[in-house]
């Protein structure tokens, strides 16, 4: 089974287009290409109840922790750096042969 490459990479600024965090802009912390999901900072926060565990020094850690959960890539769009609006991603090959991502709306390089 082959894994499709994601057009959204770590460090990109994206906007959430559906769900409870719709309209929120954030930076991609991590990409999961095998699941087609991305982790966006400050978005899709969930609450986890962790069990209290003894550490080596005798301190206890546990309780209620809030953290980000991955979001499917179809629910986010990359933000165009030229005007700050969401756009689709295209590809162009430069004169030197390198493949670069471009904004479909403005044609600017991402």
Swiss-Prot record:
It comes from the Bacteria. GO terms for biological process: translation. GO terms for molecular function: rRNA binding; structural constituent of ribosome. One of its GO terms (cellular component) is ribosome. Pfam families: KOW, ribosomal_L24. InterPro entries: KOW, Rib_uL2_dom2, Ribosomal_uL24, Ribosomal_uL24_CS, Ribosomal_uL24_KOW, Translation_prot_SH3-like_sf. PROSITE patterns: RIBOSOMAL_L24. Keywords: Ribonucleoprotein, Ribosomal protein, RNA-binding, rRNA-binding. One of two assembly initiator proteins, it binds directly to the 5'-end of the 23S rRNA, where it nucleates assembly of the 50S subunit. One of the proteins that surrounds the polypeptide exit tunnel on the outside of the subunit. Part of the 50S ribosomal subunit. Belongs to the universal ribosomal protein uL24 family. This is Large ribosomal subunit protein uL24. It comes from Frankia alni (strain DSM 45986 / CECT 9034 / ACN14a).
């Amino acid at each position: 089974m082959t894994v499709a490459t994601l057009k959204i990479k770590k460090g990109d600024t994206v906007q959430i287009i559906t769900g409870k965090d719709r309209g929120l802009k954030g930076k991609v912390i991590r990409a999961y290409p095998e699941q087609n999901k991305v982790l966006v900072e400050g978005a899709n926060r969930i609450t986890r109840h962790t069990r209290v565990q003894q550490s080596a020094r005798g301190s206890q850690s546990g309780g209620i922790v809030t953290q980000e959960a991955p979001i499917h890539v179809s629910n986010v769009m990359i933000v165009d750096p030229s005007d700050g609006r969401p756009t689709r991603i295209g590809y162009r090959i430069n004169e030197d042969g390198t493949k670069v991502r471009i904004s479909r709306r403005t044609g600017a390089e991402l």
